[in-house]
């Protein structure tokens, strides 16, 4: 109960920072200190902030948080930072996952539950399969030390949760394996963001307006 209370207090702390300092995007150093020094997981609190469309990215990923914030502004729907953790060439799919910071509105019906971190065994995390639907995938990247936008379309398929936490099986259309391989070869950071819906052209327009090179996959 003590660890759970600490996790909930993180949510209230982030809320207060948002209200007091007018902060719309957070990059949280979620490990190891959150576990070893404070004693809880920050995934659940960040998920609740993401639900409010206040970007909360884990692993202190500043550009990841900015990426989510841009999607929030363009789409007025929650965005989520994920790892690309698996690619199945035969199935033409990849898996998007993170420990448990997806907002509940992204959950497949009747699938959400609360859980503890798979490694650290501390609360609070969300646990569910991502709901099926079309998505826009985006990253503000500095790969090769050059600022750029990466944007692509995808679709979350109706599949079971692949891992503990929050995950979804995603198709990027034809040649998903090749597209993911090209991303990795380009040196893209290991996080991408997505939101449900199609803001592909909006991202391209923003890149043009800001004069930031925009690459479509």
Q: In which residue ranges do the predicted regions lie?
A:
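C-terminal catalytic subdomain
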Residues: 53-164
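Generic structural signal for well-ordered, non-membrane alpha-helical segments
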Residues: 3-11, 59-63, 196-199, 203
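Extended hydrophobic packing segments that form well-structured cores
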Residues: 121-217
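Acidic catalytic cores of enzymes that act on phosphate-bearing nucleotides/polynucleotides
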Residues: 40-53
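Flexible, glycine/charged-enriched surface loops at secondary-structure junctions
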Residues: 3, 22, 29, 77-85, ...
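Short acidic, glycine/serine/threonine-rich loops at helix termini
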Residues: 36-42, 92-95
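Predominant activation on well-ordered alpha-helical scaffold segments within soluble catalytic domains
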Residues: 11-15, 64-72, 203-207
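A charged, amphipathic alpha-helical module
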Residues: 1-40
């Amino acid at each position: 109960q003590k660890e759970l209370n600490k996790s909930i207090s993180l949510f209230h702390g982030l809320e207060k920072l948002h209200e007091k300092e007018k902060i719309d995007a957070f990059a949280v150093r979620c490990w190891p200190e959150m576990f070893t020094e404070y004693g809880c997981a920050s995934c659940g609190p960040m998920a609740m902030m993401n639900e409010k469309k206040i970007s909360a990215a884990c692993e202190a990923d500043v550009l990841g948080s900015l990426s989510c914030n841009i999607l929030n502004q363009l789409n007025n729907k929650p965005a989520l930072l994920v790892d690309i953790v698996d690619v199945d060439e035969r199935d033409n799919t990849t898996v998007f996952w993170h420990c448990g910071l997806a907002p509940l509105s992204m959950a497949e019906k009747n699938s959400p539950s609360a859980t503890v971190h798979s490694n650290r065994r501390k609360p609070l995390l969300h646990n569910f399969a991502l709901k099926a639907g079309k998505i826009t995938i985006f990253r503000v990247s500095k790969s090769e030390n050059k600022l750029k936008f990466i944007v692509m379309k995808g679709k979350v398929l109706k599949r079971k949760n692949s891992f503990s936490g929050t995950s979804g099986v995603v198709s990027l259309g034809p040649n998903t394996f090749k597209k993911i391989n090209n991303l990795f070869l380009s040196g893209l950071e290991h996080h991408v963001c997505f939101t449900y819906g199609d803001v592909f052209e909006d991202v391209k327009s923003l890149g043009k307006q800001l004069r930031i090179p925009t690459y479509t996959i």
